[in-house]
Curated annotation (Swiss-Prot):
Disulphide bonds in the chain: 4-17, 8-31, 25-36
GO molecular function: calcium channel regulator activity; toxin activity
Pfam family, one: Toxin_20
Coiled-coil zones: none
Top-level division of the source organism's lineage: Eukaryota
Family: Belongs to the neurotoxin 12 (Hwtx-2) family. 06 (TXP1) subfamily.
UniProt name for this protein: Omega-theraphotoxin-Ba1b
Job description of the protein: Inhibits voltage-gated calcium channels (Cav) in rat cerebellar granule cells. Has insecticidal activity to crickets (Acheta domesticus). Is not toxic to mice.
A GO CC term assigned to this protein in UniProt: extracellular region
Organism: Brachypelma albiceps
InterPro entries found in the cross-reference section: Hwtx-2-like
Protein keywords: Calcium channel impairing toxin, Disulfide bond, Ion channel impairing toxin, Neurotoxin, Secreted, Toxin, Voltage-gated calcium channel impairing toxin
Main location: secreted
């Protein structure tokens, strides 16, 4: 499972790719260079 390397607080479509307190991205989001990507 891919883990976020950067703290990804940027929200896209109203949903954070990495909720605060979580170590992994959820909901199909992935963090890439501090950007949220839906895969």
């Amino acid at each position: 499972i891919f883990e976020c390397v950067f703290s990804c607080d940027i929200k896209k479509e109203g949903k954070p790719c990495k909720p605060k307190g979580e170590k992994k991205c959820t909901g199909g989001w992935r963090c890439k260079i501090k950007l949220c990507l839906k895969i």
